[in-house]
């Protein structure tokens, strides 16, 4: 949301565009991509699949996420906008890996 203010200058009136700080802080909501424990696929397969689907994950990150899901039932893969979150989750599902998304608080 923007507000236009007229200010007197030396020669003419000048239009100045001001943005409300609240409008700048209004960001799109983020979503968590969750990996669920998988008793079917091997740990190695899940680690490889995580790195293929989310290329910014290091091997160590992928292993940590896989172990978190294995030990706790669910692991946090990434927090991002809705569209990439849906893509990541669906890509994991297409590889036979259980995944879901939920809104980040």
UniProtKB/Swiss-Prot annotation:
Taxonomic superkingdom: Bacteria
One Pfam family matching this protein: ClpS
Gene Ontology biological process terms, A to Z: protein catabolic process; proteolysis
Matching InterPro entries: ClpS (IPR022935), ClpS_core (IPR003769), Ribosomal_bL12_C/ClpS-like (IPR014719)
PANTHER family: ATP-DEPENDENT CLP PROTEASE ADAPTER PROTEIN CLPS (PTHR33473:SF19), ATP-DEPENDENT CLP PROTEASE ADAPTER PROTEIN CLPS1, CHLOROPLASTIC (PTHR33473)
Quaternary organization: Binds to the N-terminal domain of the chaperone ClpA.
Function: Involved in the modulation of the specificity of the ClpAP-mediated ATP-dependent protein degradation.
Family membership noted in the UniProt record: Belongs to the ClpS family.
Protein name: ATP-dependent Clp protease adapter protein ClpS
Species in which this protein is naturally found: Prochlorococcus marinus (strain MIT 9515)
